UniProtKB/Swiss-Prot annotation:
InterPro entries, A to Z: Signal_recog_particle_SRP19, SRP19-like_sf, SRP19_arc-type
HAMAP family: SRP19
GO cellular component, as recorded: signal recognition particle
GO MF assignments: 7S RNA binding
Record-stated family: Belongs to the SRP19 family.
Name of the protein this chain belongs to: Signal recognition particle 19 kDa protein
Location within or outside the cell: Cytoplasm
Top-level taxon in the UniProt lineage: Archaea
Gene3D superfamilies registered for this protein in UniProt: Signal recognition particle, SRP19-like subunit
Gene Ontology terms: biological process: SRP-dependent cotranslational protein targeting to membrane
Length: 100
């Protein structure tokens, strides 16, 4: 099982890859919240090890305040980081579709 850090900016469709988005824009979600990421990870049976809501991804220190998303989640997943992030983004999209 791989252990890695997930930053909300890695899933944020408003950001370019230069500022840390990892998933393709077609899968990414707008302004993902830490709670959504944790809920998606738990539903996918990933182990949530630590959640810190006040952390800022160092890549975001030089951009506009409105694009900064705070939070950091440490996960353990049977997949690699890229695949795990894609699954989480898809699950968040599913949650948002259901609630809309």
């Amino acid at each position: 099982m791989g252990r890695f850090v997930v930053w909300p900016s890695e899933l944020d469709s408003r950001l370019s890859r230069k500022y840390g988005r990892i998933v393709p824009r077609s899968i990414a979600v707008e302004s993902p919240r830490v709670e959504e990421i944790v809920r998606a990870a738990e539903e996918l049976k990933f182990k949530v090890i630590r959640v810190e809501e006040d952390k800022l991804n160092p890549r975001l220190s030089g951009i506009d305040e409105e694009l900064r998303t705070f939070g950091m989640i440490v996960l353990e997943s049977p997949y690699g980081k890229s695949k795990s992030l894609k699954l989480i983004a898809q699950k968040i999209r599913e949650f948002r579709r259901r609630s809309a």
